[in-house]
């Protein structure tokens, strides 16, 4: 298993209190595949450098995951299907 850092930018129209519960269904995929969620860091609403889908702000979330690469690819695919997700970025952490 490898360490990954995933940054997610969520549509600012979503209430910040509902961000963690809405991400739980994606994090459950990691847990079911014998991975672990090391940290969930919700930065809150921030201004974007450039507009994404005509939005100037987004809710930033940073996840630290320990899982297989196929699991990360599946989560990224599912997040990109979701209309509330503006952008995702996955980085493999150095050991």
Swiss-Prot record:
A Gene Ontology cellular-component term: cytoplasm
Matches recorded under Gene3D superfamilies: 3.30.70.60
GO terms for biological process, alphabetical: translation
InterPro entries cross-referenced by the UniProt entry: Ribosomal_bS6, Ribosomal_bS6_sf, Ribosomal_S6_plastid/chlpt, Transl_elong_EF1B/ribsomal_bS6
Taxonomy, superkingdom: Bacteria
Function: Binds together with bS18 to 16S ribosomal RNA.
Family listed: Belongs to the bacterial ribosomal protein bS6 family.
PANTHER family named among the record's database cross-references: MITOCHONDRIAL 28S RIBOSOMAL PROTEIN S6, SMALL RIBOSOMAL SUBUNIT PROTEIN BS6M
Protein name: Small ribosomal subunit protein bS6
